């Protein structure tokens, strides 16, 4: 695989920087005036400390970028953009393919800091796994009064159809995406749990490939942990979950189709795992078993990694008009003849109101204090907390429990009196559907803005894979960046982008694999997207296309709810 073509003056990096003298004025053109705006004055900057010194993990990146002038910064940014376009990396919004902007400056996390995050994410996934097993089983946490029963019965993602479906190896959460932010003290906090079909891991892998091409020398001087083995961990988890044909189970990826926002990711993961990418019309059920139609005839399916929301999964159990799912799929799962990943009904674990009780779950199931704290949250369904929200509505961020993509959020300090009055009415009319949080100062990372670098808010979505024996956390995750000045909305649909996330390996590490740039560029599989039908060779029903666009639950979008 060839590397991205850069202008000749950019092809050498380290030696060139040492041999050529640069004036301080040139450095000022890149970092000059960095973080002088009051907008980010209270935020924790991940590259610079409060005295303006470069933090340890970023010293190499700073040394590479600081001597550059505006033309060099622009050249690298253009090379980066070309690479993304050439690789066909897009997301779908309202049926239109759009590029997903990748910023030039990676986000760097030290080995020790990542170790703490890894432990906290693993703890959280284990507690949520125990909670889901309990909720769809004996419901001891409800009988003991630890959380209120009406919290579950009022959750639209609690599905009684899932009762009695017991995962063969006890795993319901095969993949989790735990959204994190960093507060003004530099502490990571959990913003949200995504336990259904968390999206975005394809961009993690593609970001790495692209940055490795544009900054090959940086990978030679940094011990960056690899991300290209995600698909192998996911495949192991899926195969381990099989109840039938355990020695050689047939695994498929079930997609709503090309109109879905995350179709690029569905096809990429299927290719990397070496399994079939199927739509609902490719599968059928007979005698409580699931079969796939192939050119060689019927083939029994043992594990379905579905990227379809519960509501569209089985028209006999959920939406009767669904053309995306497979009739009889739920009964086949209940009979133990197929495993659906992630499990039906997992949404009762990532409801935004349920999120507020996760620390309580950890103490109940694990007898442990949370290693990663939640963001402080007021629950509008509780009378006293609802009144506090209404009293402080000008100072809070109001979030719909079922919101996604950043839509429906009301930022109290920025809202008009009319908007706040409308929000107050919604809260009074349906308090179960709203939570409120303080305006959080997200951390910032230098981001290309025109011909210079400026701070922009970021979040992080690490991905955890549970294979039944261990919870493995992909080193890094998807860093999303709010490209609009002052905005805290990182969603791609509202002007957000992403960054490559580097987790540095410890100096004496035997279990943490790292790659140099050459190996990264050569080893990552090609990821050109599957050809999209133009409408003539492959007829598509109109309801299917409409539902494929509609069936984009929060975890299927590259977005923060």
Curated annotation (Swiss-Prot):
SUPFAM superfamilies from the UniProt entry: Glutathione synthetase ATP-binding domain-like (SSF56059)
Coiled-coil zones: none
UniProt superkingdom: Bacteria
UniProt biased composition (Low complexity): 541-561
Region (Disordered): 1-22, 522-561
Gene3D superfamilies with a match to the protein in the record: 3.30.1490.270, 3.40.50.11290
InterPro entries: ATP-dep_Glu-Cys_Ligase-2 (IPR051680), CP_ATPgrasp (IPR007302), UCP005522 (IPR016450)
Composition-biased stretches (Polar residues): 1-11
Similarity comment: To Synechocystis PCC 6803 sll0335 and to M.tuberculosis Rv2567.
PANTHER family: BLR5612 PROTEIN, SLL1039 PROTEIN
Protein name: Uncharacterized protein ML0605
Species: Mycobacterium leprae (strain TN)
């Amino acid at each position: 695989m060839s590397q991205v073509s850069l202008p000749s003056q950019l092809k050498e990096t380290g030696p060139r920087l040492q041999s050529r003298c640069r004036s301080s004025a040139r450095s000022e053109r890149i970092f000059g005036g960095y973080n002088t705006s009051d907008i980010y004055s209270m935020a924790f900057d991940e590259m610079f400390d409060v005295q303006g010194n470069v933090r340890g993990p970023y010293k190499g990146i700073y040394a590479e970028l600081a001597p550059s002038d505006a033309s060099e910064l622009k050249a690298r940014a253009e090379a980066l953009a070309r690479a993304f376009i050439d690789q066909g990396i897009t997301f779908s919004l309202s049926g239109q393919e759009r590029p997903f902007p990748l910023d030039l400056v990676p986000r760097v996390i030290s080995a020790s800091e990542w170790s703490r995050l890894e432990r906290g994410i693993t703890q959280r996934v284990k507690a949520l796994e125990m909670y889901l097993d309990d909720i769809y089983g004996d419901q001891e946490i409800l009988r003991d009064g630890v959380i209120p029963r009406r919290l579950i019965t009022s959750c639209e993602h609690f599905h009684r159809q899932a009762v009695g479906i017991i995962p063969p190896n006890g795993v319901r959460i095969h993949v989790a995406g735990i959204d994190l932010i960093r507060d003004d003290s530099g502490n990571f906090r959990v913003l949200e749990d995504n336990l259904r079909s968390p999206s975005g891991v394809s961009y993690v892998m593609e970001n790495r490939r692209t940055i490795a091409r544009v900054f090959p020398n940086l990978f030679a001087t940094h011990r960056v942990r690899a991300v290209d083995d995600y698909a192998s961990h996911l495949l192991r988890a899926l195969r381990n979950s099989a109840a039938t044909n355990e020695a050689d189970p047939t695994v498929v990826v079930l997609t709503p189709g090309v109109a879905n926002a995350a179709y690029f990711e569905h096809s990429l993961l299927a290719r990397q795992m070496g399994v079939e990418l199927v739509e609902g019309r490719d599968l059928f059920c007979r005698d409580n078993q699931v079969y796939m139609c192939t050119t060689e005839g019927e083939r029994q399916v043992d594990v379905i990694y579905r990227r379809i929301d519960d509501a569209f999964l089985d028209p006999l159990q959920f939406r009767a008009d669904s053309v995306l799912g497979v009739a009889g799929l739920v009964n086949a799962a209940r009979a133990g003849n197929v495993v659906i990943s992630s499990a039906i009904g997992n949404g009762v674990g990532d409801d935004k109101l349920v999120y507020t009780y996760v620390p309580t779950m950890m103490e109940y199931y694990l007898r442990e204090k949370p290693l990663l704290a939640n963001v402080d949250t007021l629950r509008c369904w509780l009378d006293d907390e609802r009144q506090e929200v209404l009293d402080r509505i000008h100072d809070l961020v109001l979030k719909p429990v079922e919101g996604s993509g950043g839509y429906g959020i009301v930022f109290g300090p920025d809202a008009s009196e009319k908007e706040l009055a409308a929000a107050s009415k919604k809260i009074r009319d349906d308090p179960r559907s709203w939570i409120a949080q303080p305006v959080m100062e997200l951390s910032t990372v230098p981001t290309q803005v025109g011909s210079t670098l400026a701070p922009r808010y970021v979040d992080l979505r690490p991905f955890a894979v549970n294979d039944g024996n261990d919870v493995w956390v992909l080193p890094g995750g998807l860093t999303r960046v709010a490209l609009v000045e002052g905005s805290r909305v990182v969603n791609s649909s509202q002007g957000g982008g992403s960054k490559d996330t580097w987790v540095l390996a410890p100096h004496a590490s035997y279990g943490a694999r790292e790659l140099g740039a050459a190996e990264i560029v050569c080893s990552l599989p090609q990821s050109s997207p599957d050809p999209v039908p133009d409408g003539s060779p492959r007829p598509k029903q109109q309801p299917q296309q409409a539902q494929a666009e509609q069936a984009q639950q929060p975890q299927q979008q590259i977005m923060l709810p």
